[in-house]
Amino acid sequence: MAANKDEFSVKQIFPKLGGERGARNPRYGPTSSHDLVEQMEFLYVQVIQAINNSVVNPSARICCPVVEITLGNYKSSTKNLPMGPNMDWNQVFAFDKSKGDVLSVTLKDGPTNTVINKRNFKLASEIPTRVPPDARIAPQWYSMHNTETDFYMELLMSVWFGTQVDEVYPEAWFSDACEVCASRVINTRPKVYLAPRLCYVRVTIVSGHDLISKDKNKTPSVYVTATLGKVALKTKVSSGTNPSWNQDLIFVASEPLEGTVYIRLIDREDEQHEGCIGTLKKKLTEMTPLKVPSSAPALFYDIEMPTEVKPAGDSRRFASRLKMKLATDQAYHVAEECTQYSSDNRAFVKGLWPGLLGKLEIGILGATGLKGSDEKKQTIDSYVVAKYGNKWARTRTVVNSVSPKWNEQYSWDVYEKCTVLTLGIYDNRQILEDKNKANDVPIGKVRIPLNRVQSDWIYTCSYPILKLGSSGLKKMGELQLAVRFVYVAQGYARYSAPFRWMLPKAHYKSPLSMYQIDKLRAQAVEINCANLARTEPALRSEVVSDMLKPKSRNFSIRISKDNFDRLYTVVKMVLWCVSVIASVRSTTACTPKFIALGVSFVFLFWEYYIYWLVTSWLVAYCIVLCIVVILLREILKSPRQTYNWLFYRNVTPPPLILVDLKLRKLDSINLDELAEEFDSFPSSENDLNILRMRYDRLRKIMENVMLLMGDAATQGERLLAAFTLLERPFVLIILLALCYCSMLVVCLGWDLHVRKCLIFVFICYWVQLPWFRNNLPDGSLNFFRRLPSNEDLMF
């Protein structure tokens, strides 16, 4: 199965950003707060309050007003909105400006559905336009009288044309979501979330003292459990009245650090029975805050013992004690993402943060050709979530559209450029009453590494949303983005940033193991899910966990081939140099051999002339000439772009390449390899023939790996065997004699010319001139091949 390269490639687009005001690529920061998105014009209608002034008809005094707003085929209403005690709603409705010519506002009596009055506004002449930072349009009272029913009402509202820059945009009820239940409209609104920063809590259980078992005739076998929130960890079992553990139990907590760690000592009486012999609880605020890489002091803590284990017959106070180190490790960065997709490396304490490096700005323009997981559903209620650091941004939900337009702009502070911005697009399942328990469905993700983004450029591209499954590579649509990174730091702070530590110093002074980092990352994801689920509107747990989902570690032949090709690309240049040198030795032609000897002779005996050539003006003139030729070649290659860059600083950068199909082995996909990659563990494949075929294929691959590993081990064992020969006295005597002869040659050849002659003779022998040529193996190589290895001992 071959993938279409053009279909899955990043395409360059040319939107009218910010109405094309100002430069496309400013050199000194953004021109406005919304210059990375296209301007969208909306008709805003703010319905604030209604007043009933009916005095003639007593029945008209009892009125439940409902406001209906109509523009073209779109209709919105306050029917399902909660009404205040003074008949107030204070709700903003937003309509697409191009959907009609006349805006109709109708006031009705809700129970009887009686029309009280109607107001029509012509869009072309009667509605003002407001562009921030202009002051907001003042609301007006509109008389809504009905002489037939004796209703005398007044409606307070305001109508104006605005854009997505307007302050009411995040709280507006858009016309495309008019069918959404009023209680669910909040789930369609854009929002920015700040996830609480995370911190490690280190509980080091050192030892116990004077522990008492429930069974007075038995030596206690105790382990310690510590619980913080929903996470419980325990130590190994240690026996004795004064057991020792010296074991770290590490938790993840979020700011503010207000939790409590509950510690219990469990006595293992036998294989099936256990009993608690002591408890202790400590608040996080009572622990030692470590703001530098260090260790907390070890202190003794009295344990609260159950009554059944207290010593009898002694009225004096007796307490078992537990020696522990309790600290909040604030000098670490808590990883919630995998290393490849990390967006933040800062420590918990702000005093250890590096200086601000720059600003990242993202304009989420829209999407095209979206496909959901449910093929029967023709439309999608989509929204985008962008995550960088602890700041999450969520766009509004565009209802019933496979090509939504958002045009929302967000920005982040950047402290490390070697990070990744993650954007995910999801199908909103929370906007209908019958979808209360449904989860939002992920459509796909786009990741942008910042180290590939050049500063002060605006990248306007359409990124494919790719989904790889057992059936192959599938395109779920395209996400249109405008990306810009602007440096804030200048001078030394900017140019020294690539050389500073990527992680806080504590990660290098007291590093955590990969196993610990993976376990703590799982804790961090759960805490983030819980914290963001408590916001309003909630960023659901399935969305957060999907955004923080790490790379799969399942076995994949496709990725194995990919990693081999990457490794081969890295060492290909070294292999090329080795092959060139080997070809000089092995060739029978005299020309390359004499060229090598000539170059060696010049560098050995004519170094004075080389020094004169380097320090002369001739070399400087040649370098300047080469620079001029290179610049002229670039200018003549693309004269239009050079002209724009010189006079307007306006050059369209090339699109960011986020996925290399050929590198990832996605240009020609083997479906069975994909099926094996996405198979569960243990395998859920029931066809024995397929399992046998996969097993035989893996055996063939591992056969080559086995032989390669065996050859490498054999050569390494022969090298070790050469050192073991030094244990024999005869070999040691010969080695000392050779060392003495070598020193004698060096001393005799200490004269500069003699040493150069010796080196030149060695080079002549090494390049194998015709009179030195011998196709038989060298003596040292013969000796090395005769050294023993453990391969002879294997059965």
UniProtKB/Swiss-Prot annotation:
PROSITE patterns: C2. Keywords: Calcium, Endoplasmic reticulum, Membrane, Metal-binding, Repeat, Transmembrane, Transmembrane helix. Ca(2+) 2 binds at residues 57, 109, 113. It comes from the Eukaryota. GO terms for molecular function: metal ion binding. It is a multi-pass membrane protein. CDD domains: C2C_MCTP_PRT_plant, C2D_MCTP_PRT_plant. Expressed in root vascular tissues and meristems. Observed in flowers. It is found in: Endoplasmic reticulum membrane. Residues 24-142, 180-298, 341-463 form the C2 domain. The chain crosses the membrane at residues 590-610, 612-632, 730-750, 752-772. InterPro entries: C2_dom, C2_domain_sf, C2C_MCTP_PRT_plant, C2D_MCTP_PRT_plant, MCTP_C, QUIRKY-like. Its cofactor is Ca(2+). Ca(2+) 1 binds at residues 57, 109. It holds the Pfam family C2. GO terms for cellular component: endoplasmic reticulum membrane. Belongs to the MCTP family. May function as a signaling molecule by regulating the trafficking of other regulators. This is Multiple C2 domain and transmembrane region protein 12. It comes from Arabidopsis thaliana.
